[in-house]
Structures are given as structure tokens and as C-alpha cells.
Amino acid sequence: MAEPKPEAAALQAMSINLAMAAAVKGSDVVHSHTWYANFGGHLAKLMWSVPHVMTIHSLEPLRPWKAEQLGGGYALSLFCERTGVEGADAVIAVSHGVRKDILDCYPDVDPDRVSVVHNGIDPDEYRPQPSSETLLRFGIDPSKPFAFFNGRITRQKGLPLLLAAALKVDPTHQLVIVASSPDTPEIAAEVDGLVRRVREERGGLIWIDRFIPREDLIHLHSDAAVFVCPSIYEPFGLVILEAMACETAVVASRVGGIPEIVVEGETGYLVDYKAEATDDFTSALAGRIDELLSDPALARRMGKAGRERVIHHFGWPAIARQTVALYEGLLGGSKISR
């Protein structure tokens, strides 16, 4: 059966809103995530007179490349997000950077309704778990340090920029890239071409273009000397928390919420990104990657500091307490049953 056209898929997502809104009758609070669920939360607020809490993980107006993926469905996602955020009783931004973006994109939203609650992670699940067996299974040389990327093939995640930087990285250094689920055929073809070019011009690229189990990802995070996040737009950066929890140093773009996670010079390095200066960005990215791959002691020190930061600032208990406090504030101080 052929895949539905993007516009049809967007309408199907809208139809799910009706079922979600009907299912929450009798709830004290409705809390939604993503543009289509947020519209469902808005409908539930109208029908059942319950407070609607809306978490913003990213903003549609700041992702114009989504039009390439969604077609006319992008206009629908813009409408749903605006309607939801302007009508919500409380809006949670996953970073201070996102909070600023919300108020810039939607000036009619009362700033007092927008709070920051970071995303969280379970550091007991994501912890150092090295595995030479996993490295060998993927064709990675355990005797050589490597830089690691894990993410979707999208404009947002900056994979073409990382592949351009790979041409500038010391050719004796290994680069391991796990990437799948391209947004469009166009970006899939672009990335395939860049991978071929990197392989022609240098060795040491391990390209894994398929989904791999979480256990294997944790092993790769744990064995990597550095995790690379070259995103051009990143409201938070959960994958960075996953890497840091596994004691991996980070080299990342200085965009969005990333500077709220990575402490410059302590848990990794931040690289300035400007759309009009991508060559400077890829050169700086390659330089920081080489620096950490050439200095294992520094990479280990940053990795250990990163895990400590995750445990103290991004564990789920702290995130849950902040969220429950927001619910109780909306309910006039009434306690939420645990």
C-alpha cells in the first residue's frame, strides 16, 4: 500500500485529536506534547473545562524545512500549534531558549503562563556500559578512539554539516555515524552523496544507516571518546544528555537549549553556528573533535563531569517535582495524587 501523501497524513493526525479529546473526560488536568496532540488538548479544554498544560519541544515557525516534508500539512501544523499555545492555561518550555522563542513567535501569549522545565533522563539506564563485542560487531576498531553521532537524517540535526566536517578531521581518527529515517528523498540523496565522498577521501568512517537497539546505542555512547551534535536548531538536545550520562564528552552547536546542558570547557565544547558561515562552523567542529580524540585524558575528565551534571540537574525526580508543582498551581493548590 502506498504511503499517504503528507497532507493526508496531517489530516489523519488531526482525526486522532478527536479521539484523544474524548478520552480525557473526567481528568483534572490535560497535558499534551507535539503540535497535533496539543490541538487535542485544546479541544479537551473547550469540551470538558479542564486546564490544558502544553509542553513545547520545538516550534513550527522555526522549522521551515518541515514544509519540504509535510507539504500543505505544514500550514496545518502551524495553525494547530498557534491555537494550542495561545489557548493553553500553562505552557512548559523545555529550555530557556525555547521560552524566549515562544514569546518571540507568539507575542499574544502572557509570559507569566510560560515556565521552563527541562527534559529529564534516567541515569540508571543511561550509564557507562562499554562493550568491545558491540564495537567489533559494527566494524569499529576498539584500539582507536572515535567520535559518535546518533540522530535522524533531517535538516535540523545537521548531518550534512558533520559529513563536511569529517573531510577536515584527522584521517586517522574514526567517526561512527548512526543515522536513519530521512525526512525526504532529497536529503537522503544528499547525505548518501556526502557519505560516498567522505569514504573516497578518507578512511575511518563507520556508517550505520539503520535503527539499532537502545542497548547498542548505550554501548556506543559509552565507548565513544566524544559525542558530536551539529544541529542547526535544537530546542533542548536529549541525545546530549544520553551521551553525558554515559560519561562521554560532547562537541555541539551553540544553538537553542544546548548551552543549558553543555558547560563550555567542563563537559565539552560549544561551536558557534551561523547559516551564512557554514565553512567556519565545520572547521571549528572538526578542530574540537580532533582535540578531544587526541587527548583521551581530557575527554575522560569532561565525560565524568558530564555524568555528574546529568545526575544532579536532569534526573527524573527533579523534573517530576517541578511538573507536579505546576499542576497543583493550576488547581489552586489541590494536591495531585501520586
Residue ranges and their predicted role:
Residues 188-211, 215:
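Nucleotide-activated donor-binding/catalytic signature segment of Leloir-type glycosyltransferases, i.e.
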